[in-house]
Amino acid sequence: MTNREKKFTLLLILIVVGAAIYYLVKYDILLIDVKDRVNLLVAFGTVGMTLMIVYIEVIRPWIQKPEIKIEFANKRPYCRHAKTTSSSRPYYCHFAVVNSGKTLTDDCEAVLERVWDSSNEKKNSEWEEWENFIPCNLKWSAENPKEDFKRACFKTIYPGERRYFCDIGRVNEKHDTFNFELSRFFLSQVNYLSRGKHKIQISVYSKNAAKVTKKFVIDWCGEWKGTQPEMEEGLKIKML
């Protein structure tokens, strides 16, 4: 039992005991006949049980609710070259989801919701949002949507310090685009970023935790590089 739970439990006990003492003092239990004494004790017991049920069903889940947060940095392990069986070495970028609450969160999904392009490369440039962009599920790392679509889209995240990684996108060797890592995508809309500065919005939803939304600025030089320092310089991603 956490300190917060202990405080709530103590508060409930004090409420019941305080109410009992108040009525005992006000009505002098010695002057009440036996039948009324029994009824009074039953009433106090009922109130106490009701408060405990409210605590168990409402207050305790609220105290112990999951709390998810997004972590990212433009360095390993969030951004790195993949080790594959082939000679190709795609460069992947992920963010991490951590549950800092007290209970697990079910059906956690990450959704790419909005995309903007920068009108120019200046610091104070305006952003032009992609029109009619349809939100898409990003893929949880190390999952293959062709083998198990549900596992690729939805994740159970347990409380603690463990980081659950979700893919943002990748750059393939000898390619000049930053491709979003989507579980499924629409053929009617673009699923990659070309050279330049862009901004994206990602939200993480779940069955029993509050939605978390973050924006990322992606500054992409348009050329895959073979070393980590070169890629960190050529593909700069900042979480706002």
Task: Name the predicted role of every residue range.
Residues 5-65:
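Membrane-embedded hydrophobic alpha-helical segments
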Residues 58-86:
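Low-complexity, acidic Ser/Thr/Pro/Gly-rich terminal tails and inter-domain linkers that flank the onset
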Residues 85-94, 197-199:
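Short, solvent-exposed loop/turn segments enriched in Ser/Thr/Gly
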Residues 94-98, 111-113, 201-205:
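Residue-level recognition of well-ordered beta-strand positions that form the cores
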Residues 99-104, 116, 208:
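Short, acidic/polar linear motifs in exposed loop/turn regions
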Residues 103-112, 121-125:
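Short, hydrophobic/aromatic beta-strand segments
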Residues 127-194:
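Extended, solvent-exposed segments with strong compositional bias
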Residues 147, 155, 188-240:
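Acidic, serine/threonine- and proline-rich intrinsically disordered appendage/tail regions
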